[in-house]
Design a protein with these regions (language model features):
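Cysteine-nucleophile amide-bond enzymes
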Residues: 1-252
Length: 252
């Protein structure tokens, strides 16, 4: 069902098969620890919990040097031939050092040089203003992508990114992409969200009725810092703000 939805959305069979083989390898390596047996399981109010220690132990046995793929690599890998950037785009890959390590030690070469450049451009860290006003940061993110000519086209699938603001004081503020996934429509008018939770945690496919539910899930997962002088995370769909994005948790 998932493969069909990905292919129907216009993603290349090669990329989809590569994703499936990564998923199979991962699940086999961790011996399906904590995974749903078949089909979909209803999400309770709490997001899925996995036994990370057990997973890590099994993973490290097979891959002592390779930390696994993460959300950004997985999402980009599915959509890499639909994403283009300026050849001389400005890159700040300071937050991607673990991604780079994973790609370096991966069992197979994931990206060409050009694709790696697009990967690092898309997920570049940006300097931003010292403010908790989300709109200011959204404009910054959009402007940077526009300047770097980041384009996502030729597919019904969309790239979902969760952008975080980090403040290290008045003069040092950054935007970075903390999570990414791929959203595809299904035949029955639902949405499938394909993600890898982290380097060590599983691949997940979640089914939502609409973007409002997806927003609820993602903000529940990632809007977690309290009392910081930082703006709320925001969610982009391709290069625009996701429709139905809103802050759910109002801080007092």
């Amino acid at each position: 069902e998932v493969k069909k939805a990905l292919l129907d959305a216009g993603l290349s069979e090669k990329n989809v098969n590569a994703w499936l083989s990564d998923v199979k390898d991962y699940n086999k390596t961790i011996k399906n620890t904590g995974l749903v047996k078949k089909g979909f399981k209803k999400l309770s109010t709490k997001n899925p919990q996995y036994d990370e220690n057990k997973i890590m132990e099994l993973w490290n046995k097979k891959y002592p040097d390779f930390i696994g793929y993460n959300c950004r690599i997985t999402a980009f890998d599915l959509m890499k031939d639909k994403i283009s950037v300026k050849a001389d785009a400005k890159v700040n890959a300071s937050n991607l050092f673990m991604d780079q390590d994973a790609l370096k030690h991966a069992p197979a070469k994931k990206f060409t040089k050009k694709q790696k450049h697009a990967f690092e451009t898309l997920y570049s860290t940006l300097n931003t203003a010292y403010t908790t006003d989300v709109d200011t940061h959204i404009k910054k993110q959009k402007k940077a992508w526009k300047q770097n000519e980041v384009k996502i086209s030729g597919t019904k699938a969309s790239l979902i990114t969760v952008v975080f603001h980090s403040s290290f004081g008045k003069n040092e503020n950054e935007l970075s992409i903390g999570h990414a996934g791929v959203l595809v429509p299904t035949k029955d008018k639902k949405l499938l969200f394909v993600e890898k939770l982290s380097f060590s945690l599983p691949y997940q496919v979640l089914k939502f009725d609409n973007r409002k539910q997806l927003n609820h899930y993602l903000m529940g997962m990632y809007d977690t810092s309290w009392g910081q002088e930082e703006a709320k995370p925001f969610i982009m769909e391709n290069t625009n703000l996701m429709k139905d994005y809103r802050v759910i948790r109002k801080d007092k």
